[in-house]
């Protein structure tokens, strides 16, 4: 996605239910960006990601859901997320934590962005980054990207059984993200 990182043996690596991910240190916080929590075919319900071998990098933010073009003046200042790479396979999340100890039992805060289910992303504004909140609140912070607008809420049920849940795909993504948090943090 255009970001390049130099990895070292000291970068934090954690085990998820699907496999290991490599994050990075951000001041006093450990950060893991763009972790896939689910996968789905277009207009279908999300499924858990398939397990992998080796270590996947969680060093850069993942894709945001494709967004409608907005032509209001100065929109790039108000909503810089429209310049982030967009793709319908946007079921990813970001985690910031002070501790890698699985027994630490820190409170977890999950950020589901606004936007009326048609706009927004987990990374649309610098204020959504969880490193400061994690550091000063001593909590684990998770921000979630999920399907929006027609990719997440278009009712295609009249076109057959295959699409019976299409109007709830975006909500199902959020539930899948919460399940991932429950299973992995």
Give the ranges of each region predicted by the language model.
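Non-catalytic accessory segments of hydrolases
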Residues: 1-171
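Alpha/beta-hydrolase active-site loop
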Residues: 164-185
